Amino acid sequence: MHINFDEAQMFCKWKDKRLPSEEEWIYAAYTEMRKTSSSNFIYGQTYEYPVGDTPEGVNCLEDCKFKNNVNYKKLLSRGNGHSKVGVTKKGINGLYDMGANVWEWANIENKRTKATKGGSWWYGKEQMHLKHQARKDKKMSAVYIGFRCVKSLN
């Protein structure tokens, strides 16, 4: 995506939204908050990965058992590249692509570095684990970093 933190934040603001805080991102990605779920996720339970107890079904470098619907292998020296949005396994809270595909910017108080969450197709399953911490310079951009906007409810 090649979007740095400030660019992602400006886009969200333009859409009358914002980047999630790191805490909001973690909560949405790992803790099931739907009282009735069409998946087998249990209300109130926190999972190890954004798709449950294992990383199976997401677009990561290895160990995730996902077959990408787009073949970038000839263009890349590593990994499979991005997958189309929403084609990976549906995760916690019915959200897609919270694990792997692209790191997502999340806001923290530090002025120079910001959080990136969820891992990406460039990395293995460890980077999308609940306990993984990643910080990047807010001016950094890379093909494997993206974002999602959120809207405050109040």
Across the structure, where does each feature detected by a protein language model lie?
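Functional-site microenvironments in short loops/helix caps that host divalent-cation chemistry
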Residues: M1-A134, K138, V143
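Short, structured beta-strand segments at or near domain termini in extracellular proteins/domains
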Residues: Y144-N154
